[in-house]
Amino acid sequence: MSTESAKPALSQEAIVAQFQQLRNEQRNLVNSLNTLEMDLREHKTVIETLEAADPERKCFRQIGGVLCERTVKEVLPQLVENKDFIAKTIQMVTNDLSKKGSELNKFKEEHNIKIRGEHLVAEGAKGDDAEDKAENRNVLVFN
């Protein structure tokens, strides 16, 4: 009888572990997306600056940790190509992120997972109750 009661606990632990893994994957995608968006902004700024510069002016570009001397007309097309690639990658990561969010929500519904504190954010808790409820945030509950 004790082995029968141990099985559900293990399965719940496995469910929690899988849920946490899905959440971590989602966080990693968000971090990747933020990094890519920062890179895109930097590329746009550099491209705007170089477009205003003389095409024969020398500039420096770091390639794999090595600083290379080039001209603006050599570097600009490479930067535009990199910017376009980053924009496409951002679109792919955004799609992956929405799929991961759907997968996470489906997993929550299938296993009846509720996160304590989720409803508090939506309600916008105020006053002394907010302090009491803040302690209970982000706790997984299984039914």
Curated annotation (Swiss-Prot):
Gene3D superfamilies with a match to the protein in the record: 1.10.287.370
Signal sequence extent: none
GO biological process: establishment or maintenance of neuroblast polarity; protein folding
InterPro entries tied to this protein: PFD2, PFD_beta-like, Prefoldin
Keyword Iron-sulfur: no
GO terms, molecular function: protein folding chaperone; unfolded protein binding
Keyword check for S-adenosyl-L-methionine: no
Disulfide bonds: none
Keywords carried by this UniProt record: Chaperone
Annotated family: Belongs to the prefoldin subunit beta family.
Function: Binds specifically to cytosolic chaperonin (c-CPN) and transfers target proteins to it. Binds to nascent polypeptide chain and promotes folding in an environment in which there are many competing pathways for nonnative proteins.
Subunit comment: Heterohexamer of two PFD-alpha type and four PFD-beta type subunits.
PANTHER family per record: PREFOLDIN SUBUNIT 2
Protein name (record): Probable prefoldin subunit 2
Species per Swiss-Prot/TrEMBL record: Drosophila melanogaster
Species lineage: Eukaryota, Metazoa, Ecdysozoa, Arthropoda, Hexapoda
